[in-house]
Amino acid sequence: MTGGRFDFDDGGTYCGGWEEGKAHGHGICTGPKGQGEYSGSWSHGFEVVGGYTWPSGNTYQGYWAQGKRHGLGVETKGKWMYRGEWSHGFKGRYGVRQSLCTPARYEGTWSNGLQDGYGVETYGDGGTYQGQWAGGMRHGYGVRQSVPYGMATVIRSPLRTSLASLRSEQSNGSVLHDAAAAADTPTGTRGGFVLNFHADAELAGKKKGGLFRRGSLLGSMKLRKSESKSSISSKRSSVRSDAAMSRISSSDANSTISFGDVDCDFCPVEDHVDATTTETYMGEWKNDKRNGFGISERSNGMKYEGEWANNKRHGYGCTVFPDGSKEEGKYKNNILVRGIRKQLIPIRNTKTREKVDRAIEGAQRAAAMARTKVEIANSRTAHARAKADAADQAALAARQECDIARAVARELSPDFYQPGPDYIKQRLQEGVDAKENPEEKVPAKPPTPKESPHFYRKGTTPPGSPEASPKYSRSPQPSPPKPAKKQNPSSGARLNQDKRGVAEEQVTAIVNKPLTSKAPTKEVGAAVSQSKYSGRHHVPNPSNGELHSQYHGYYVKLHAPQHPPVDAEDDDRSSPSSSALVHKPSPNKWSPPKSVTKPVAKESKAEPKAKKSELAIPKNPASNDSCPSMEREANSGPNSVMIVLVMLLNIGLAILFVHFLT
């Protein structure tokens, strides 16, 4: 057997022994472009026992077959470690995956790299699931046991987090960013608690205080009557069905399909549960959620037996409350839609009674089946732990073969660079830095783009914004403008178009500075003077005009031209400016029916300002006949708004009237 160093065309290198042109014995091989490293024993071109190190620092140490991980081995990826069997590159059949930072772990059977068969999953807060699995999800029969409510992990995301489950990382070991970013959302639930009923009397009043609440305006009169006459305990029972919401368990926080499990209307409100209370669910699971028949029971006496759908009470069932009262019937998304409630006259419906009884029997059978599956899962877990211990021995043997291969490589080629140890050192250094400076590892929220409109005031131009194209912008003439009493029709039309494009915030600016705060013209008036002004360049001349720093480059006259008052009135009637549209319609067109004198006072104050703003802008009587459509829009706009407001007011008064009568 000979040996040496061989460089591949793709940038990889093999340094070690070979036989008949194939790697044989001990050696080190790097991947394309020198990325990744395998060191260990070889047999006719294939890895046998050794370790592979990725550039990210993730490692595998164990047995190989036909170039794939096969047999027993240990994989370290990110904050997780898998110890157990491997089959053609995938995890399986028995193995244990555990977190390096929390108690989270899975022990059981695997298939194609996912949990499949029977197993036990322990979550970051100590809660457990024991039962059947399929395709990496809880599927079949199983038991979900929570820890005391005070110790349960607060899950703040509909996505799974690495604290709560095992399926929280990508293939390269990096944690999903969505799970970290969603920690800022207000949705907070306790792991393993789905029977979250808001039993507080004040919350009951708050829940039922809305105008359009269920049962107030168009609902049943009996519900309102029972609420007014019953005690606090009956209020609690009456609101349990309406306000109860589904809470995802801690295991549900990382499933790729566990979206929409939380009703955001009640997320910020926490139930008043004793810190020592625990909850257990025994029954059917489908696609990682409670689906089918099952029983959910709390240690304080609360219990539900019946049908489930997507972690919610859905179908027929019976709920027993801690005080001994109960409600039974048909549920739909945690709401009792048909059945028997406390303090209400029982519905004499034998079919409903029979369906409830059948649902309870089905739930009890499912719970019994789940308990038998738990026993099988525990036996599979014991076997998986034994395989994990054997995998540790295989990893130890792989490390020994790795050391031999490194010694052989150094002997054959002293200058050969072995990247594996550097990958591991870099990963360890990153871990130390993360512990010393945890605040640096917190991903900062991406800044809002600079072009976001809320970074600037209204009426101002963001810095760095491109200049308007000549097609839609007008620059003043190169020659210095002189004060003139007469204007040609084209300039008058351009100024009138300027008035129409004034923004809403210009009204205040014109009143205060009528000569220097003119807003930029809009594209509506650009077409009027396009042929005359589009090809000219802007020549600043501070002697005759003042350039407004907040708008585009155009001049505003320092001396307002004098016009007869008749022209201003005619122009006001023909082409109203935006300031006139802002101040006049509300007092003139519509006023509240109860107060008549106040709008008159506002009208008398608003007209001088509007006229003053109009007089501050040059006008041209020649353009009065050019905008009848603007006049119609100004007259029709406030009318439609007034009609809508009056209709809404009438509807609101009618609803209040009916509400008080009922």
From Swiss-Prot:
GO cellular component: junctional membrane complex; junctional sarcoplasmic reticulum membrane; nucleoplasm; plasma membrane; Z disc
Keyword Cell membrane: yes
Positions where Phosphoserine occurs in the chain: S157, S216, S220, S452, S465, S469, S475
GO biological process: muscle organ development
Compositional bias (Low complexity): 584-599
Positions of transmembrane segments: 641-661
Region of interest: Disordered: 228-247, 432-634
Membrane association type: Peripheral membrane protein; Single-pass type IV membrane protein
Topology, Cytoplasmic side: 1-640
Compositionally biased residues, Basic and acidic residues: 432-443, 600-614
Family annotation (InterPro entries): Junctophilin (IPR017191), MORN (IPR003409)
Keywords (A to Z) from UniProt: Cell membrane, Endoplasmic reticulum, Membrane, Phosphoprotein, Repeat, Sarcoplasmic reticulum, Transmembrane, Transmembrane helix
UniProt subcellular location: Cell membrane; Endoplasmic reticulum membrane; Sarcoplasmic reticulum membrane
Single GO MF descriptor: structural constituent of muscle
Gene3D superfamilies listed in its UniProt record: Histone H3 K4-specific methyltransferase SET7/9 N-terminal domain (2.20.110.10)
Phosphothreonine modified-residue sites: T448, T461
Any Pfam family: MORN
Cell membrane among keywords: yes
Positions of MORN repeats: 14-36, 38-59, 60-82, 106-128, 129-151, 281-303, 304-326
Comment, domains: The MORN (membrane occupation and recognition nexus) repeats contribute to the plasma membrane binding, possibly by interacting with phospholipids.
Protein name listed in UniProt: Junctophilin-1
Source organism of the structure: Oryctolagus cuniculus
Originating gene: JPH1
